[in-house]
Amino acid sequence: MKKALALILAAAMSCSLVLTGCGGGNAAAGSASTGAAAAGAQSLTLATGGTTGTYYAVGGVMSTVLNKKLTKSSLTVTSTGASKANIQLLSDGEANLAIVQNDVMHYAATGTDLFEAEGKYESFSSVCGMYDETVQLVTTNANIKSVKDLKGKTVCVGDAGSGTEFNAKQVLAAYGMSFDDITVNNASFGDSADSLKDGKIDAAFVVAGAPTTAVVDLSTAAQVYVIPVDGAERDSLMKDYAFYTKTTIPAGTYKGQDADVETVSVRATLIAADDVSEDSVYELVKAMFDNQEELVKGHEKFNNLKLEDATKGIDVKFHPGAVKFFKEKGIDVA
Protein backbone atom coordinates (compact mmCIF):
# COMPACT_ATOMS: atom_id res chain seq x y z
CA MET A 1 0.00 0.00 0.00
CA LYS A 2 2.81 2.40 0.89
CA LYS A 3 4.60 1.48 -2.33
CA ALA A 4 1.55 2.15 -4.47
CA LEU A 5 0.85 5.49 -2.82
CA ALA A 6 4.43 6.64 -3.22
CA LEU A 7 4.48 5.70 -6.90
CA ILE A 8 1.23 7.56 -7.54
CA LEU A 9 2.58 10.64 -5.78
CA ALA A 10 5.82 10.44 -7.71
CA ALA A 11 4.04 10.08 -11.05
CA ALA A 12 1.46 12.77 -10.42
CA MET A 13 3.52 15.40 -8.67
CA SER A 14 7.16 14.93 -9.60
CA CYS A 15 9.12 16.82 -12.18
CA SER A 16 12.64 15.50 -12.14
CA LEU A 17 15.46 17.74 -13.30
CA VAL A 18 18.24 15.52 -14.53
CA LEU A 19 21.89 16.31 -14.04
CA THR A 20 22.53 16.78 -17.73
CA GLY A 21 20.25 19.82 -17.47
CA CYS A 22 16.92 20.80 -18.95
CA GLY A 23 15.92 24.00 -20.64
CA GLY A 24 13.38 26.57 -19.55
CA GLY A 25 13.78 26.09 -15.79
CA ASN A 26 14.36 28.60 -13.05
CA ALA A 27 18.09 28.77 -12.36
CA ALA A 28 17.52 28.68 -8.63
CA ALA A 29 15.44 25.52 -8.91
CA GLY A 30 17.53 23.70 -11.49
CA SER A 31 19.69 20.71 -10.90
CA ALA A 32 21.97 20.78 -13.88
CA SER A 33 25.44 19.73 -12.88
CA THR A 34 28.31 21.97 -13.87
CA GLY A 35 30.77 20.03 -11.79
CA ALA A 36 32.82 16.97 -12.49
CA ALA A 37 31.51 14.24 -10.22
CA ALA A 38 33.89 11.32 -10.07
CA ALA A 39 33.15 8.27 -12.18
CA GLY A 40 31.07 5.84 -10.16
CA ALA A 41 29.72 8.55 -7.85
CA GLN A 42 26.46 7.61 -6.14
CA SER A 43 23.52 9.31 -7.89
CA LEU A 44 21.14 10.65 -5.25
CA THR A 45 17.59 11.85 -5.85
CA LEU A 46 16.59 14.74 -3.56
CA ALA A 47 12.84 14.93 -2.92
CA THR A 48 11.66 18.48 -2.23
CA GLY A 49 8.17 19.95 -2.67
CA GLY A 50 5.97 21.66 -5.23
CA THR A 51 7.69 23.59 -8.01
CA THR A 52 6.54 26.96 -6.65
CA GLY A 53 7.61 26.21 -3.08
CA THR A 54 10.69 26.89 -0.99
CA TYR A 55 11.78 23.25 -0.67
CA TYR A 56 12.06 22.90 -4.44
CA ALA A 57 13.99 26.15 -4.81
CA VAL A 58 16.34 25.29 -1.93
CA GLY A 59 16.94 21.82 -3.36
CA GLY A 60 17.70 23.28 -6.76
CA VAL A 61 20.36 25.57 -5.29
CA MET A 62 21.89 22.64 -3.42
CA SER A 63 22.15 20.71 -6.67
CA THR A 64 23.55 23.61 -8.68
CA VAL A 65 26.18 24.57 -6.09
CA LEU A 66 27.11 21.25 -4.52
CA ASN A 67 27.36 19.13 -7.66
CA LYS A 68 30.46 21.19 -8.45
CA LYS A 69 31.98 20.17 -5.12
CA LEU A 70 30.93 16.55 -4.55
CA THR A 71 33.01 13.54 -5.56
CA LYS A 72 31.15 10.73 -3.76
CA SER A 73 27.69 11.56 -5.11
CA SER A 74 25.67 13.78 -7.41
CA LEU A 75 22.24 15.29 -6.76
CA THR A 76 19.09 15.21 -8.87
CA VAL A 77 16.17 17.29 -7.64
CA THR A 78 12.57 16.12 -7.95
CA SER A 79 9.36 17.97 -7.06
CA THR A 80 6.88 16.15 -4.82
CA GLY A 81 3.95 16.61 -2.48
CA ALA A 82 6.39 17.73 0.26
CA SER A 83 7.09 16.25 3.70
CA LYS A 84 4.72 13.27 4.01
CA ALA A 85 5.16 12.20 0.39
CA ASN A 86 8.93 12.54 0.77
CA ILE A 87 9.01 10.11 3.69
CA GLN A 88 7.05 7.60 1.63
CA LEU A 89 9.30 8.03 -1.39
CA LEU A 90 12.44 7.41 0.69
CA SER A 91 10.89 4.32 2.23
CA ASP A 92 10.08 2.87 -1.18
CA GLY A 93 13.44 3.67 -2.76
CA GLU A 94 12.05 6.33 -5.09
CA ALA A 95 14.31 8.98 -3.50
CA ASN A 96 17.51 8.94 -1.46
CA LEU A 97 17.43 12.35 0.23
CA ALA A 98 14.56 14.64 1.19
CA ILE A 99 13.71 17.94 2.82
CA VAL A 100 10.95 17.53 5.40
CA GLN A 101 9.58 19.24 8.49
CA ASN A 102 11.05 17.75 11.64
CA ASP A 103 7.63 17.25 13.20
CA VAL A 104 6.48 15.23 10.19
CA MET A 105 9.55 13.00 10.35
CA HIS A 106 8.85 12.52 14.08
CA TYR A 107 5.33 11.35 13.24
CA ALA A 108 6.77 8.97 10.63
CA ALA A 109 9.39 7.51 12.94
CA THR A 110 6.85 6.97 15.73
CA GLY A 111 3.83 6.01 13.60
CA THR A 112 1.69 8.78 15.10
CA ASP A 113 -0.59 11.59 13.90
CA LEU A 114 -0.05 11.94 10.12
CA PHE A 115 1.28 8.36 10.00
CA GLU A 116 -1.00 6.72 12.56
CA ALA A 117 -2.87 4.70 9.93
CA GLU A 118 0.30 3.55 8.15
CA GLY A 119 2.56 2.79 11.08
CA LYS A 120 6.24 3.54 11.58
CA TYR A 121 8.74 4.37 8.87
CA GLU A 122 12.16 3.39 10.15
CA SER A 123 14.49 3.31 7.13
CA PHE A 124 15.57 6.96 7.15
CA SER A 125 17.85 9.12 9.29
CA SER A 126 18.40 12.80 10.04
CA VAL A 127 21.20 14.70 8.33
CA CYS A 128 20.84 18.30 9.54
CA GLY A 129 18.33 21.01 10.36
CA MET A 130 18.30 23.78 7.75
CA TYR A 131 15.93 26.61 8.71
CA ASP A 132 12.91 27.48 10.85
CA GLU A 133 9.31 27.07 9.77
CA THR A 134 7.60 29.29 12.26
CA VAL A 135 4.22 28.75 13.91
CA GLN A 136 2.46 32.06 13.25
CA LEU A 137 -0.99 32.71 14.68
CA VAL A 138 -2.29 35.59 12.59
CA THR A 139 -5.36 37.78 13.06
CA THR A 140 -6.75 41.12 11.94
CA ASN A 141 -8.78 41.47 15.14
CA ALA A 142 -7.08 43.76 17.67
CA ASN A 143 -9.13 42.19 20.48
CA ILE A 144 -7.44 38.81 20.01
CA LYS A 145 -4.26 39.14 22.06
CA SER A 146 -3.72 35.58 23.30
CA VAL A 147 -4.31 32.02 22.16
CA LYS A 148 -6.99 31.84 24.86
CA ASP A 149 -8.90 34.60 23.07
CA LEU A 150 -9.57 32.17 20.23
CA LYS A 151 -12.33 30.50 22.23
CA GLY A 152 -15.58 30.74 20.29
CA LYS A 153 -13.82 32.15 17.23
CA THR A 154 -13.54 30.82 13.67
CA VAL A 155 -9.94 29.76 13.14
CA CYS A 156 -8.22 28.36 10.05
CA VAL A 157 -5.92 25.49 11.03
CA GLY A 158 -4.44 24.72 7.62
CA ASP A 159 -5.57 22.11 5.13
CA ALA A 160 -7.37 19.08 6.56
CA GLY A 161 -4.86 16.41 7.59
CA SER A 162 -1.90 18.75 7.16
CA GLY A 163 1.05 19.20 9.48
CA THR A 164 -0.27 22.67 10.28
CA GLU A 165 -3.52 21.16 11.55
CA PHE A 166 -1.56 19.04 14.03
CA ASN A 167 0.53 22.06 15.07
CA ALA A 168 -2.68 23.97 15.76
CA LYS A 169 -4.07 21.12 17.88
CA GLN A 170 -0.84 20.96 19.89
CA VAL A 171 -0.68 24.72 20.51
CA LEU A 172 -4.31 24.85 21.60
CA ALA A 173 -3.77 21.88 23.94
CA ALA A 174 -0.90 23.71 25.62
CA TYR A 175 -3.41 26.42 26.50
CA GLY A 176 -5.98 23.92 27.78
CA MET A 177 -8.08 24.11 24.63
CA SER A 178 -9.11 21.87 21.74
CA PHE A 179 -10.84 22.12 18.38
CA ASP A 180 -14.11 21.84 20.32
CA ASP A 181 -13.45 25.37 21.62
CA ILE A 182 -13.27 26.95 18.16
CA THR A 183 -15.05 26.77 14.83
CA VAL A 184 -12.53 24.97 12.64
CA ASN A 185 -11.84 26.22 9.14
CA ASN A 186 -9.57 24.24 6.80
CA ALA A 187 -7.79 26.07 4.00
CA SER A 188 -4.38 26.84 2.54
CA PHE A 189 -2.28 29.76 3.79
CA GLY A 190 -3.23 31.87 0.78
CA ASP A 191 -6.94 31.16 1.12
CA SER A 192 -6.89 31.77 4.87
CA ALA A 193 -5.26 35.17 4.29
CA ASP A 194 -8.05 36.06 1.86
CA SER A 195 -10.65 34.93 4.41
CA LEU A 196 -9.05 37.09 7.09
CA LYS A 197 -9.11 40.08 4.76
CA ASP A 198 -12.78 39.46 3.95
CA GLY A 199 -13.74 38.95 7.60
CA LYS A 200 -14.84 35.34 7.08
CA ILE A 201 -12.54 33.98 9.81
CA ASP A 202 -11.06 35.46 12.97
CA ALA A 203 -7.56 33.99 12.95
CA ALA A 204 -5.32 31.54 11.12
CA PHE A 205 -2.41 29.27 11.91
CA VAL A 206 0.39 29.61 9.37
CA VAL A 207 3.48 27.39 9.64
CA ALA A 208 6.17 28.65 7.30
CA GLY A 209 9.33 30.70 7.23
CA ALA A 210 8.74 34.29 8.35
CA PRO A 211 8.07 36.56 6.60
CA THR A 212 5.46 34.45 4.82
CA THR A 213 4.25 35.79 1.47
CA ALA A 214 0.55 35.26 2.23
CA VAL A 215 0.85 37.25 5.47
CA VAL A 216 2.96 39.98 3.84
CA ASP A 217 0.28 40.39 1.18
CA LEU A 218 -2.45 40.49 3.83
CA SER A 219 -0.59 43.20 5.76
CA THR A 220 -0.82 45.52 2.75
CA ALA A 221 -4.61 45.36 2.90
CA ALA A 222 -5.29 45.13 6.65
CA GLN A 223 -3.62 45.57 10.02
CA VAL A 224 -2.09 42.22 10.92
CA TYR A 225 -1.45 41.02 14.47
CA VAL A 226 0.74 37.99 15.26
CA ILE A 227 -0.31 36.34 18.52
CA PRO A 228 2.48 35.01 20.79
CA VAL A 229 2.99 31.43 21.90
CA ASP A 230 5.11 31.95 24.99
CA GLY A 231 5.50 31.60 28.73
CA ALA A 232 4.57 28.46 30.64
CA GLU A 233 2.40 27.27 27.77
CA ARG A 234 5.32 27.33 25.36
CA ASP A 235 7.49 25.50 27.89
CA SER A 236 4.79 22.84 28.24
CA LEU A 237 4.45 22.52 24.46
CA MET A 238 8.19 22.03 24.01
CA LYS A 239 8.30 19.50 26.84
CA ASP A 240 5.56 17.43 25.20
CA TYR A 241 6.95 17.75 21.65
CA ALA A 242 10.73 17.79 21.31
CA PHE A 243 10.56 18.93 17.69
CA TYR A 244 9.57 22.50 18.65
CA THR A 245 12.21 25.18 19.22
CA LYS A 246 11.86 28.71 20.62
CA THR A 247 11.62 31.42 18.00
CA THR A 248 11.32 35.19 17.95
CA ILE A 249 9.60 36.92 15.04
CA PRO A 250 11.49 40.25 14.95
CA ALA A 251 9.66 43.56 15.04
CA GLY A 252 9.08 44.84 11.53
CA THR A 253 8.74 41.40 9.96
CA TYR A 254 5.25 42.47 8.92
CA LYS A 255 3.85 45.92 8.24
CA GLY A 256 2.64 47.45 11.50
CA GLN A 257 4.37 44.84 13.69
CA ASP A 258 6.06 47.12 16.20
CA ALA A 259 7.38 44.55 18.69
CA ASP A 260 9.08 41.16 18.71
CA VAL A 261 6.70 38.21 18.96
CA GLU A 262 7.68 35.05 20.83
CA THR A 263 6.52 31.74 19.40
CA VAL A 264 7.82 28.30 18.36
CA SER A 265 9.08 26.76 15.15
CA VAL A 266 9.48 23.41 13.53
CA ARG A 267 12.54 22.95 11.32
CA ALA A 268 13.02 22.20 7.65
CA THR A 269 15.36 19.23 7.88
CA LEU A 270 17.48 17.25 5.44
CA ILE A 271 17.09 13.48 5.82
CA ALA A 272 18.60 10.48 4.05
CA ALA A 273 17.61 6.89 3.42
CA ASP A 274 19.62 4.56 5.62
CA ASP A 275 21.17 2.85 2.60
CA VAL A 276 22.91 6.03 1.42
CA SER A 277 26.60 5.56 2.15
CA GLU A 278 28.26 7.16 5.16
CA ASP A 279 30.86 8.75 2.90
CA SER A 280 28.22 10.35 0.67
CA VAL A 281 26.26 11.87 3.54
CA TYR A 282 29.42 13.07 5.30
CA GLU A 283 30.70 14.75 2.15
CA LEU A 284 27.29 16.30 1.45
CA VAL A 285 26.72 17.88 4.86
CA LYS A 286 30.34 19.07 5.00
CA ALA A 287 29.97 20.65 1.56
CA MET A 288 26.81 22.45 2.68
CA PHE A 289 28.57 24.18 5.55
CA ASP A 290 31.84 24.73 3.66
CA ASN A 291 29.99 26.41 0.78
CA GLN A 292 27.29 28.27 2.68
CA GLU A 293 28.26 31.65 1.24
CA GLU A 294 27.72 30.39 -2.30
CA LEU A 295 24.45 28.68 -1.30
CA VAL A 296 23.17 31.97 0.16
CA LYS A 297 23.68 33.66 -3.21
CA GLY A 298 21.20 31.16 -4.63
CA HIS A 299 18.60 31.31 -1.84
CA GLU A 300 18.35 33.45 1.29
CA LYS A 301 17.15 30.50 3.40
CA PHE A 302 20.75 29.29 3.59
CA ASN A 303 21.49 32.29 5.84
CA ASN A 304 19.76 30.18 8.50
CA LEU A 305 22.06 27.17 8.06
CA LYS A 306 23.91 27.42 11.37
CA LEU A 307 26.04 24.76 13.00
CA GLU A 308 24.72 25.66 16.46
CA ASP A 309 21.13 25.07 15.29
CA ALA A 310 21.67 22.13 12.94
CA THR A 311 20.74 19.46 15.49
CA LYS A 312 18.07 21.33 17.48
CA GLY A 313 14.55 19.94 17.58
CA ILE A 314 15.59 16.65 15.99
CA ASP A 315 14.60 13.47 17.82
CA VAL A 316 15.06 11.00 14.94
CA LYS A 317 18.37 9.12 14.76
CA PHE A 318 21.19 10.74 12.77
CA HIS A 319 22.78 9.12 9.73
CA PRO A 320 26.32 7.80 10.42
CA GLY A 321 27.71 10.29 7.90
CA ALA A 322 26.10 13.17 9.79
CA VAL A 323 27.29 11.75 13.12
CA LYS A 324 30.85 11.76 11.77
CA PHE A 325 30.58 15.37 10.60
CA PHE A 326 29.07 16.73 13.80
CA LYS A 327 31.56 14.79 15.93
CA GLU A 328 34.38 16.57 14.09
CA LYS A 329 32.69 19.85 15.02
CA GLY A 330 32.45 18.88 18.69
CA ILE A 331 28.72 18.13 18.60
CA ASP A 332 27.63 14.75 19.97
CA VAL A 333 24.49 13.43 18.27
CA ALA A 334 25.10 9.69 18.62
Question: Language-model segments: what does each one mean?
Answer:
Residues 132-144, 240-242, 263-279:
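A bilobed periplasmic-binding-protein/Venus flytrap-type ligand-binding module shared by bacterial periplasmic
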Residues 41, 72, 82, 92, ...:
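Extracytoplasmic
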Residues 41, 45-69, 73-77, 132-198, ...:
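Bilobed "Venus flytrap"/periplasmic-binding protein-like clamshell domains
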Residues 1-44, 334:
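Short, low-complexity disordered leader/linker segments with a strong preference
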Residues 102-104, 111-115, 179-270:
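Pocket-lining segment of extracytoplasmic ligand-binding domains
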Residues 60-64, 76-117, 137-140, 190-195, ...:
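Pocket-flanking alpha-helical
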Residues 107-111, 122-129:
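Short beta-strand-centered segments that line the small-molecule binding cleft or hinge
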Residues 191, 198, 208-228, 233-242, ...:
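An extracytoplasmic/periplasmic, membrane-proximal ligand-sensing/linker region
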